[in-house]
Amino acid sequence: MFLQAVTSPISINSLMVLAAYALLGGLYLIVVPLLLYSWMNRRWHCMGKFERLSAYGLVFLFFPGLILFAPFLNLRLNGQGEV
């Protein structure tokens, strides 16, 4: 009953559009940046020049999502911490 009362003024098409925007926003801000971080972390020291160029392009494209996770991820090499 509560769900019907909440969604009655909103049409099903509007809800589908909002769901599509939420899905695309989640992909752009969360899923793809995390996949990009993991891929760059694995491949950073063995990339070729074209692969590195494409990585830079993807960083430019997905920068808002990458900057959201930057304070929480530590991608330093092993042995670069405390002495």
From Swiss-Prot:
Which reaction is this enzyme known to catalyze? Answer: a plastoquinone + NADH + (n+1) H(+)(in) = a plastoquinol + NAD(+) + n H(+)(out); a plastoquinone + NADPH + (n+1) H(+)(in) = a plastoquinol + NADP(+) + n H(+)(out)
Keywords (alphabetical) are: Membrane, NAD, NADP, Plastoquinone, Quinone, Thylakoid, Translocase, Transmembrane, Transmembrane helix, Transport
Taxonomically, the superkingdom here is: Bacteria
Q: Which Pfam families match?
A: NdhL
What Gene Ontology molecular function terms does this protein carry?
Answer: oxidoreductase activity, acting on NAD(P)H, quinone or similar compound as acceptor; quinone binding
Record's function text? NDH-1 shuttles electrons from an unknown electron donor, via FMN and iron-sulfur (Fe-S) centers, to quinones in the respiratory and/or the photosynthetic chain. The immediate electron acceptor for the enzyme in this species is believed to be plastoquinone. Couples the redox reaction to proton translocation, and thus conserves the redox energy in a proton gradient. Cyanobacterial NDH-1 also plays a role in inorganic carbon-concentration.
Query: HAMAP family from the entry?
Result: NDH1_NDH1L
The UniProt entry's sequence similarity note says: Belongs to the complex I NdhL subunit family.
Task: State the protein's name.
Answer: NAD(P)H-quinone oxidoreductase subunit L
